């Protein structure tokens, strides 16, 4: 094989033993999970915001940001459930660039996966302990989910991973909502097939074990836009797109039809300021149709402390080193605006 085996990494159980979750925090996560699940099963009409930095690059800034979210959450709790994004591993279009805290706990240092495993667990634990949030992360590597399985309340499977069998089967064994993004091509049948696979039980190999999964009835769709064969971005958040997904759900027989709309990526053509307009357009679409209202459960928004993005070596506190994000002032106002629109029945 054309690779060097550097060292054996600790198992998830070994990492959890070194950095255990106490019973009080476990109860907080359980309560969060219950509230979030009720949205996806239709028992609650609260609106979900999966919101936070494109990538969690440094612990201090991410925790600062999440504490700010906590203050806002308490003011909009009648309408909104905030699930902070703590994305600790990042897919890269060409394979080059910062791959997230799991790979590089210090973005300016060489990769160190052992330090990365510890860093991402500590970060998610701090979010729960200091702000009461059990957060969202992307399942880039299915075999790594168990390092954080007692801390996460939401998982996303990305556009480049959604066709992969191991991602689908692992999602079928999780007991939290898993969002399946449409692939970069925009083929909605791929996304629906992925949800179908995740909602059913399977026998497969996971971390060296033969396992049986029970199926995940809260696996659902994330619409993130798409790229055509010429490399041009196209949105899929408009009213007619939502109606099309609703029709696909009706034909599929899938449980708990649900959509989260990603306001960035190809939906915004990575024009981060467009996220504000897109969020409000989705809310308008919800107002226009009862079936869209029932299906669209929330939004995914990329947001941090400072507007825009930077190179990793610029070291501006709270500014994204991957995709550009909304800054805090715009984020806070957008959340308040969304809550007010919801209070007025959209």
Where are the model-predicted features located?
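N- or domain-start disorder-to-order transition segments that initiate the globular core
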Residues: 1-41
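N-terminal beta-rich core of secreted/periplasmic extracellular enzymes
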Residues: 25-42, 72-83, 89, 120
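Acidic (Asp/Glu)-rich catalytic clusters
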Residues: 40-43, 70-77, 125-130, 213, ...
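Conserved phosphate/anionic-ligand binding catalytic regions in large, soluble enzymes, centered on
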Residues: 48-61, 323
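Conserved, mostly hydrophobic/aromatic
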Residues: 52, 261, 327
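Short acidic, Gly/Ser-rich segments with clustered Asp/Glu that frequently serve as metal-coordination loops
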Residues: 54-57, 256, 264-270
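Active-site-facing alpha/beta catalytic cores
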Residues: 66, 79-244, 265-266, 270, ...
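Internal helix-turn-beta structural module
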Residues: 304-344
């Amino acid at each position: 094989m054309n690779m060097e085996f550097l060292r054996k990494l600790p198992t998830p159980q070994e990492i959890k033993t070194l950095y255990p979750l106490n019973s009080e925090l476990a109860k907080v996560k359980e309560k969060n999970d219950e509230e979030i699940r009720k949205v996806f099963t239709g028992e609650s009409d609260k609106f979900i915001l999966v919101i936070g930095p494109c990538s969690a690059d440094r612990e201090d800034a991410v925790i600062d940001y999440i504490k700010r979210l906590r203050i806002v959450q308490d003011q909009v709790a009648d309408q909104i459930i905030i699930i902070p994004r703590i994305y600790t591993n990042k897919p890269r279009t060409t394979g080059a660039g910062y791959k997230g805290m799991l790979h590089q706990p210090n973005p300016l240092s060489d990769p160190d996966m052992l330090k990365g495993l510890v860093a991402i667990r500590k970060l998610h634990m701090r979010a729960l302990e200091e702000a009461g949030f059990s957060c969202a992360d992307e399942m880039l590597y299915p075999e790594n989910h168990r390092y954080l399985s007692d801390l996460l309340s939401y998982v996303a499977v990305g556009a480049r991973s959604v066709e992969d069998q191991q991602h689908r089967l692992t999602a079928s064994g999780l007991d939290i909502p898993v969002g399946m993004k449409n692939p970069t091509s925009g083929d909605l049948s791929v996304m629906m097939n992925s949800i179908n696979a995740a909602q059913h039980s399977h026998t497969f190999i996971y971390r060296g074990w033969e396992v049986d999964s029970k199926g995940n009835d809260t696996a659902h769709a994330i619409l993130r836009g798409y790229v055509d064969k010429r490399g041009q971005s196209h949105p899929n958040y408009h009213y007619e797109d939502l109606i099309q997904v609703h029709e696909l759900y009706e034909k599929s027989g899938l449980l708990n039809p649900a959509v989260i709309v990603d306001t960035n990526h190809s939906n915004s053509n990575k024009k981060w300021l467009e996220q504000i307009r897109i969020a409000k357009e989705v809310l308008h679409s919800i107002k226009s149709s009862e079936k869209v209202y029932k299906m669209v459960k929330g939004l995914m928004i990329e947001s941090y402390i400072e507007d825009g993005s930077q190179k990793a070596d610029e070291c501006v506190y709270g500014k994204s080193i991957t995709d550009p994000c909304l800054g805090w002032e715009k984020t806070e106002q957008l959340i308040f605006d969304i809550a007010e629109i919801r209070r007025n029945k959209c």
